[in-house]
Each structure stands twice: as C-alpha cells, then as structure tokens.
C-alpha cells in the first residue's frame, strides 16, 4: 500500500526539529528499526538545515517543502527549497566543504545523506533552488521484539 505526506513550512531554524519529528512520526507506521529511524531523522535535519542556512541564508520568507512516500518498506523523500541554489554541486558534495565556515558548520551534510540513505540525487540551479531526492529501503524485521 502506498501512503504519502506533504509538508510546507517557513525557512526558520526552529522548524528543523518540527520537520524531523513529523517525518519520523509518519515513517513510524512501517516499524523501522531505531537505527533506520535515527538515520532518516538525521538526513531530514541535514537537508532542512542546508535549505534554511544556505538556500535562503536564513531569510524566513522562504519555504521548505517535504514530500514523503511510503511503499513496500521503502521510504522516498523529496526535500526542496526555492532559494539560491548551488553553483558547484560537485564541490558542495565534497566532505568538509562549506560556504559558511564562520558558522562553524562541518560541511558533512551531503556526505551524511549519502552514507545513511540508499540513493541520493540532488538537482540545483542558481537562483532557482535545490531539490534533494532520497530513498531508504527499510529492513523487514520488526523494530521491537515481542
């Protein structure tokens, strides 16, 4: 059975935790393991933080959009902004690369996403925004023992 959710919120830092918890709550119906749930929450946090800090440069008038589809123990997520976009995607995907070293960011967001998810694709155009598509195949074992 296919199930979908769509979320839109202002690009405010305090909404990052809202997005993370909302996505985790929606995915919980598939009974993921704690590791799987933690990985998904971390990825959502990284993608939303990137949209807010880099996409909109903390301009709270921007919006972040999240779509999640659940189908056959697979989680498909799209996290999108309409912000500044990424001028050099290859460089941005390098570990430790950051455009904002003054904020003491680690530059590991895309690396974390690529390590925790089964598939990651990023589409970005300057002044048009960024769309990140993520796929995670969940184990079919139950998270809790009976």
Curated annotation (Swiss-Prot):
Any one GO BP annotation for this protein? sporulation resulting in formation of a cellular spore
Please give one Pfam family short name: HATPase_c_2
Q: Which GO terms describe its molecular function?
A: ATP binding; protein serine kinase activity; protein serine/threonine kinase activity; sigma factor antagonist activity
Indicate the enzyme's highest-level EC class.
Answer: transferase
Keywords (alphabetical) are: ATP-binding, Kinase, Nucleotide-binding, Serine/threonine-protein kinase, Sporulation, Transferase
Q: Which SUPFAM superfamilies does this UniProt record tie to the protein?
A: ATPase domain of HSP90 chaperone/DNA topoisomerase II/histidine kinase
PANTHER family reported for this sequence? ANTI-SIGMA-F FACTOR RSBW (PTHR35526:SF3), ANTI-SIGMA-F FACTOR RSBW-RELATED (PTHR35526)
Q: Which family does it belong to?
A: Belongs to the anti-sigma-factor family.
Query: HAMAP family from the xrefs?
Result: Anti_sigma_F
Matching NCBIfam families, A to Z? spIIAB
Name of the protein in its database record: Anti-sigma F factor
